[in-house]
Amino acid sequence: MRLPDSCVRGTAVPAFAAWCGLFVVVALGPCRAHGEPPQPNGTIAGHPALAGSPRHTTTAQGRQGDAVNVALIGSEEELHQALAVAGWYAADPITLETSLRIAADCVLHKPYAHAPVSDLYVWGRKQDAAFEQPVGDSPKQRHHVRFWRSRELDRSGRPLWLGAATFDERVEISRTTGGITHRISPTIDSERNKLLGDAINARALDGYYWVEQFHRQRDGRNGGGDPYFTDRRLAVGVIDLRR
Protein backbone atom coordinates (compact mmCIF):
# COMPACT_ATOMS: atom_id res chain seq x y z
CA MET A 1 0.00 0.00 0.00
CA ARG A 2 1.39 3.40 -0.93
CA LEU A 3 1.21 5.83 1.95
CA PRO A 4 -0.02 9.34 1.02
CA ASP A 5 2.80 11.87 1.21
CA SER A 6 0.80 13.82 3.79
CA CYS A 7 0.82 10.78 6.05
CA VAL A 8 4.58 10.32 6.03
CA ARG A 9 5.60 13.20 8.23
CA GLY A 10 7.43 12.21 11.38
CA THR A 11 9.44 14.70 13.35
CA ALA A 12 11.71 17.08 11.48
CA VAL A 13 15.23 17.68 12.75
CA PRO A 14 18.01 19.81 11.25
CA ALA A 15 20.77 17.97 9.44
CA PHE A 16 23.43 19.11 11.91
CA ALA A 17 21.38 17.75 14.84
CA ALA A 18 20.55 14.35 13.40
CA TRP A 19 23.50 12.64 15.05
CA CYS A 20 23.94 14.52 18.33
CA GLY A 21 20.64 14.69 20.22
CA LEU A 22 17.39 13.05 21.23
CA PHE A 23 14.35 13.47 19.00
CA VAL A 24 10.67 12.70 19.13
CA VAL A 25 9.83 9.53 17.23
CA VAL A 26 6.56 9.02 15.46
CA ALA A 27 4.50 6.15 16.82
CA LEU A 28 3.62 3.68 14.15
CA GLY A 29 0.47 2.08 12.98
CA PRO A 30 -1.43 1.86 9.70
CA CYS A 31 -2.14 5.16 8.01
CA ARG A 32 -5.74 6.27 8.45
CA ALA A 33 -7.99 6.59 5.44
CA HIS A 34 -7.77 10.39 5.28
CA GLY A 35 -4.00 10.56 5.68
CA GLU A 36 -3.89 11.61 9.34
CA PRO A 37 -0.29 11.35 10.56
CA PRO A 38 0.54 9.14 13.55
CA GLN A 39 1.35 10.91 16.80
CA PRO A 40 4.76 11.09 18.54
CA ASN A 41 5.25 8.72 21.46
CA GLY A 42 8.92 8.63 22.44
CA THR A 43 12.48 9.68 21.72
CA ILE A 44 15.54 8.18 20.07
CA ALA A 45 19.13 9.25 19.64
CA GLY A 46 20.37 10.27 16.23
CA HIS A 47 22.68 7.68 14.68
CA PRO A 48 26.39 8.63 14.71
CA ALA A 49 26.87 7.39 11.13
CA LEU A 50 24.74 10.31 9.90
CA ALA A 51 27.57 12.70 10.71
CA GLY A 52 29.22 13.45 7.39
CA SER A 53 27.35 10.69 5.58
CA PRO A 54 27.36 10.88 1.76
CA ARG A 55 24.42 12.65 0.14
CA HIS A 56 24.73 10.81 -3.18
CA THR A 57 25.88 7.49 -4.51
CA THR A 58 28.58 7.31 -7.17
CA THR A 59 28.95 5.13 -10.24
CA ALA A 60 31.88 2.81 -10.93
CA GLN A 61 33.25 5.59 -13.17
CA GLY A 62 33.11 8.12 -10.32
CA ARG A 63 30.09 10.08 -11.55
CA GLN A 64 27.39 11.23 -9.15
CA GLY A 65 24.67 8.59 -8.98
CA ASP A 66 21.26 8.41 -7.31
CA ALA A 67 20.48 10.64 -4.34
CA VAL A 68 20.47 9.15 -0.84
CA ASN A 69 16.96 9.66 0.54
CA VAL A 70 16.18 7.01 3.17
CA ALA A 71 17.93 5.20 6.02
CA LEU A 72 16.96 2.36 8.34
CA ILE A 73 18.48 1.43 11.70
CA GLY A 74 18.77 -2.27 12.55
CA SER A 75 20.76 -5.44 12.06
CA GLU A 76 21.20 -7.07 8.66
CA GLU A 77 18.70 -9.77 9.61
CA GLU A 78 16.20 -7.14 10.76
CA LEU A 79 16.62 -5.22 7.50
CA HIS A 80 15.84 -8.28 5.38
CA GLN A 81 12.91 -9.29 7.57
CA ALA A 82 11.45 -5.78 7.59
CA LEU A 83 11.59 -5.43 3.81
CA ALA A 84 10.17 -8.92 3.32
CA VAL A 85 7.11 -8.29 5.50
CA ALA A 86 6.69 -4.93 3.75
CA GLY A 87 6.37 -6.73 0.41
CA TRP A 88 9.81 -6.07 -1.08
CA TYR A 89 11.98 -8.75 -2.74
CA ALA A 90 15.74 -9.09 -2.31
CA ALA A 91 17.54 -8.51 -5.61
CA ASP A 92 19.66 -11.30 -7.07
CA PRO A 93 23.40 -10.61 -7.51
CA ILE A 94 24.65 -9.65 -10.95
CA THR A 95 25.90 -12.75 -12.77
CA LEU A 96 25.95 -13.81 -16.40
CA GLU A 97 22.84 -15.89 -15.75
CA THR A 98 20.84 -13.14 -14.02
CA SER A 99 21.96 -10.55 -16.58
CA LEU A 100 20.75 -12.72 -19.45
CA ARG A 101 17.51 -13.45 -17.63
CA ILE A 102 16.60 -9.81 -16.94
CA ALA A 103 17.33 -8.91 -20.58
CA ALA A 104 15.19 -11.78 -21.86
CA ASP A 105 12.36 -11.10 -19.42
CA CYS A 106 12.22 -7.43 -20.43
CA VAL A 107 11.88 -8.43 -24.09
CA LEU A 108 9.47 -11.32 -23.50
CA HIS A 109 7.42 -9.51 -20.83
CA LYS A 110 8.06 -12.13 -18.18
CA PRO A 111 8.09 -11.33 -14.44
CA TYR A 112 11.32 -11.43 -12.44
CA ALA A 113 10.67 -10.32 -8.86
CA HIS A 114 14.32 -10.72 -7.82
CA ALA A 115 15.92 -9.05 -10.86
CA PRO A 116 19.45 -7.72 -10.22
CA VAL A 117 20.21 -4.02 -9.90
CA SER A 118 23.30 -2.25 -11.17
CA ASP A 119 26.07 -1.42 -8.71
CA LEU A 120 26.30 2.02 -7.13
CA TYR A 121 28.80 3.05 -4.48
CA VAL A 122 28.71 4.67 -1.04
CA TRP A 123 31.61 4.74 1.42
CA GLY A 124 33.79 3.34 -1.36
CA ARG A 125 31.90 0.10 -1.89
CA LYS A 126 28.90 -1.21 -3.81
CA GLN A 127 25.55 -1.73 -2.12
CA ASP A 128 25.36 -4.29 0.67
CA ALA A 129 21.71 -5.10 -0.04
CA ALA A 130 19.05 -4.22 -2.62
CA PHE A 131 15.30 -4.77 -2.72
CA GLU A 132 12.53 -4.22 -5.23
CA GLN A 133 8.82 -4.40 -5.98
CA PRO A 134 7.96 -5.30 -9.59
CA VAL A 135 5.35 -3.36 -11.52
CA GLY A 136 3.55 -4.96 -14.46
CA ASP A 137 4.64 -8.11 -16.25
CA SER A 138 8.39 -7.54 -16.69
CA PRO A 139 11.44 -6.00 -14.97
CA LYS A 140 11.14 -2.87 -17.12
CA GLN A 141 9.31 -1.08 -14.31
CA ARG A 142 9.96 -1.54 -10.60
CA HIS A 143 10.33 0.19 -7.27
CA HIS A 144 13.79 -0.45 -5.91
CA VAL A 145 16.20 0.59 -3.19
CA ARG A 146 19.88 -0.01 -2.50
CA PHE A 147 21.33 0.01 1.03
CA TRP A 148 24.85 0.45 2.42
CA ARG A 149 25.72 -0.65 5.97
CA SER A 150 27.54 1.86 8.16
CA ARG A 151 30.65 0.74 9.99
CA GLU A 152 29.66 2.92 12.95
CA LEU A 153 27.08 1.52 15.37
CA ASP A 154 24.66 3.33 17.65
CA ARG A 155 24.46 2.90 21.43
CA SER A 156 22.44 -0.28 20.94
CA GLY A 157 25.07 -1.77 18.63
CA ARG A 158 22.95 -1.35 15.49
CA PRO A 159 24.25 -0.08 12.14
CA LEU A 160 22.65 2.53 9.92
CA TRP A 161 21.57 1.34 6.47
CA LEU A 162 21.90 4.35 4.17
CA GLY A 163 19.64 3.96 1.14
CA ALA A 164 18.71 5.34 -2.27
CA ALA A 165 15.14 4.58 -3.36
CA THR A 166 14.02 5.21 -6.96
CA PHE A 167 11.44 4.00 -9.47
CA ASP A 168 12.58 2.48 -12.77
CA GLU A 169 10.27 3.86 -15.46
CA ARG A 170 11.60 2.05 -18.52
CA VAL A 171 14.64 0.53 -20.20
CA GLU A 172 16.67 2.73 -22.56
CA ILE A 173 20.14 3.49 -23.89
CA SER A 174 22.11 5.54 -21.37
CA ARG A 175 22.92 9.06 -22.52
CA THR A 176 26.21 9.00 -20.62
CA THR A 177 27.54 5.45 -21.05
CA GLY A 178 25.80 4.23 -24.20
CA GLY A 179 24.81 1.02 -22.43
CA ILE A 180 21.38 -0.43 -21.73
CA THR A 181 19.99 0.86 -18.45
CA HIS A 182 16.81 1.77 -16.60
CA ARG A 183 15.57 5.35 -16.62
CA ILE A 184 14.38 6.52 -13.20
CA SER A 185 11.35 8.64 -12.41
CA PRO A 186 12.31 12.17 -11.31
CA THR A 187 9.96 12.01 -8.28
CA ILE A 188 12.37 10.29 -5.91
CA ASP A 189 10.56 11.59 -2.81
CA SER A 190 7.54 9.49 -3.74
CA GLU A 191 9.71 6.37 -3.72
CA ARG A 192 11.18 7.28 -0.34
CA ASN A 193 7.66 7.80 1.01
CA LYS A 194 6.40 4.55 -0.50
CA LEU A 195 9.17 2.53 1.12
CA LEU A 196 8.56 4.17 4.48
CA GLY A 197 4.80 3.73 4.11
CA ASP A 198 5.12 0.04 3.25
CA ALA A 199 7.26 -0.54 6.34
CA ILE A 200 4.83 1.40 8.54
CA ASN A 201 1.80 -0.50 7.28
CA ALA A 202 3.66 -3.80 7.78
CA ARG A 203 4.34 -2.75 11.39
CA ALA A 204 8.06 -3.23 10.81
CA LEU A 205 9.18 0.10 12.31
CA ASP A 206 9.19 1.46 15.84
CA GLY A 207 9.42 5.05 14.65
CA TYR A 208 10.96 7.43 12.15
CA TYR A 209 12.12 11.01 11.79
CA TRP A 210 13.17 13.43 9.07
CA VAL A 211 16.58 15.01 8.62
CA GLU A 212 15.75 18.39 7.10
CA GLN A 213 17.98 19.98 4.44
CA PHE A 214 19.95 16.78 4.05
CA HIS A 215 20.52 17.77 0.42
CA ARG A 216 21.76 21.22 -0.53
CA GLN A 217 19.94 21.34 -3.85
CA ARG A 218 16.38 20.48 -4.82
CA ASP A 219 17.28 18.87 -8.14
CA GLY A 220 20.05 17.07 -9.94
CA ARG A 221 20.93 14.24 -12.33
CA ASN A 222 22.09 10.71 -11.65
CA GLY A 223 24.92 8.81 -13.31
CA GLY A 224 22.73 7.96 -16.31
CA GLY A 225 21.82 11.61 -16.84
CA ASP A 226 18.26 11.17 -15.53
CA PRO A 227 16.87 14.29 -13.81
CA TYR A 228 15.31 14.17 -10.36
CA PHE A 229 13.95 16.60 -7.79
CA THR A 230 13.56 16.39 -4.03
CA ASP A 231 12.32 18.23 -0.94
CA ARG A 232 15.89 17.72 0.37
CA ARG A 233 14.87 15.50 3.29
CA LEU A 234 16.24 12.16 4.49
CA ALA A 235 13.80 9.75 6.17
CA VAL A 236 15.30 7.68 9.00
CA GLY A 237 13.32 4.68 10.27
CA VAL A 238 14.00 2.48 13.30
CA ILE A 239 13.27 -1.21 12.68
CA ASP A 240 11.32 -3.11 15.34
CA LEU A 241 9.71 -6.40 14.32
CA ARG A 242 8.36 -7.21 17.80
CA ARG A 243 5.31 -4.97 17.37
Which residue ranges define each predicted feature?
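N-terminal secretory signal peptides that target proteins for export/translocation
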Residues: 1-13
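Bacterial N-terminal signal peptides
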Residues: 14-29
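Sec/Tat signal peptide C-region and signal peptidase I cleavage site
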Residues: 31-34
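Compositionally biased P/S/T/G-rich terminal and signal peptide-adjacent segments
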Residues: 36-61
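Terminal, regulation- and interaction-focused segments at domain boundaries
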Residues: 53-81
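Envelope-exposed proteins and targeting segments
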Residues: 66-68, 86, 143
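Primarily extracytoplasmic ectodomains and periplasmic/lumenal surface modules that are beta-strand-rich
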Residues: 75-93, 97
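A cross-kingdom signal targeting lumenal/periplasmic-facing segments of multi-pass membrane
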Residues: 94-243
